[in-house]
Regions:
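Alpha/beta catalytic cores of nucleotide-metabolism and tRNA/nucleoside-modifying enzymes
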Residues: 1-19, 232-253, 257, 263-322
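N-terminal capping/small domains of soluble enzymes
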Residues: 2-114, 120, 295
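Short, surface-exposed connector motifs at secondary-structure boundaries
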Residues: 30, 108-114, 174-179, 250-254, ...
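Hydrophobic faces of well-ordered beta-strands that scaffold small-molecule active sites
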Residues: 36-39, 59-61, 114-118, 141-143, ...
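Acidic-and-aromatic substrate-binding clefts and catalytic sites of carbohydrate-active enzymes
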Residues: 44-46, 124, 287
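Conserved strand-to-helix beginnings and helix N-cap segments that scaffold or border functional pockets
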Residues: 49-50, 126-127, 191, 289-293
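Short gly/pro/ser/thr-enriched loop/turn and capping motifs at secondary-structure boundaries
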Residues: 66-70, 148-150, 212-215, 286-288
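Alpha/beta enzyme core
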Residues: 121-257, 265-270, 274
């Protein structure tokens, strides 16, 4: 991305480059010291060997189910132009093992909000995980509604208004923590899904999840992934994420965690300008584990260059076309 031309309209009347930036944000009543979190599926405790995770605004876990999930057969990762396909299959240790083995290490980091991402194969499974995690000291729950509904022939929960509403409502009833609903981009009208989640009791939204894609090896004449299809992530989907965040911000008054191809501080600022309150970093962290911290530093630089003193000020400064 390139720095805007100097003759572009300035969104701020003045700035003080020496003033300390206010990077804090509040998502559904939970204060983050800055707007950067990890995207679900891309963070493990091994990141502690690469950087101080306490510098993050929040940490988002891998998907947590009622019982361990083995994940899909290999190969389940494939590179593409502008990103990658993954069909890991939400492999996880199950909620009891996660609570016993991983939560204490995260909880030991002072001032770091923990967002527990939950997955399920039925509405009842989602509700059970939400209820169990609500008994712990996680700070927020993120509902991944891109999982296939085994009772409805494998249709993803998040691709119909009815599925979004029913799943969100059930989890909202079971959860005693602020609830973020993670929206799928594999829909015709994402604003309809956002409204359904809001109507069912979501406290915040996160978007976008991965786009469904496929890769074929033309010389072997075989589909690359054992699962055939996978979720496309990386810089290639970033413009789609920006567009969807922009649309959802104008349709629903809930806080938004924007994600999708965030590789730089400029990418993060772009999502905030589109209407996100916070930003999740995913694929970039798979390439270099400390990417979230680098992107946070770059976001500071962008804000100073354009004169935004706070994340809120940046979010409210988009110059719309005449």
């Amino acid at each position: 991305m390139h720095e805007p031309a100097q003759n572009n309209p300035a969104p701020f009347h003045s700035s003080d480059s020496g003033k300390e930036l206010d990077l804090s944000v509040e998502i559904a009543g939970v204060r983050w010291k800055n707007p950067i979190t990890t995207a679900s599926g891309t963070f493990t405790l091994n990141a502690r060997a690469c950087y101080d995770i306490g510098r993050l605004g929040a940490v988002t876990t891998k998907g947590i189910a009622t019982v361990p999930w083995p994940g899909n057969k290999t190969p389940r990762i494939a590179e593409t132009y502008g990103g990658m396909l993954n069909a890991v299959g939400l492999q996880n240790v199950g909620m009891e093992a996660w609570i016993r083995d991983e939560l204490p290490a995260l909880r030991s980091v002072p001032g770091l909000p923990i967002i527990a991402n939950i997955v399920g194969k039925t509405v009842e499974e989602y509700a059970a995980v939400a209820a169990r995690l609500s008994e712990t000291d996680v700070d927020m729950i993120e509902l991944n509604i891109s999982c296939p509904n085994v009772k409805e022939g494998g249709i993803a929960f998040g691709t119909t208004v009815e599925g979004v509403y029913a799943t969100t409502a059930a989890v909202r009833k079971a959860a005693k923590k602020p609830l973020i609903v993670k929206l799928s981009p594999n829909v015709t009208q994402i604003c309809d899904m956002a409204k359904a989640a809001a109507d069912a009791g979501a406290d915040a939204l996160s978007l976008i999840n991965t786009l469904l894609g496929m890769k074929i090896d033309v010389y072997r004449r075989k589909v690359v992934l054992a699962n055939k299809t996978g979720g496309l992530s990386g810089p290639g989907i970033h413009p789609i994420a920006v567009r969807m965040v922009y649309e959802v911000r104008r349709a629903v008054p809930l806080p938004i965690v924007g994600m999708g191809g965030v590789m730089s501080g400029e990418d993060a600022a772009e999502l905030i300008l589109a209407g996100a309150d916070a930003v999740a970093v995913g694929t970039a962290a798979l390439l270099t584990p400390d990417a979230p911290i680098r992107i946070l530093g770059e976001l500071r630089t962008v804000m100073r260059k354009i004169g935004a003193a706070s994340v809120r000020e940046l979010k409210n400064s988009l110059v719309e076309p005449a």
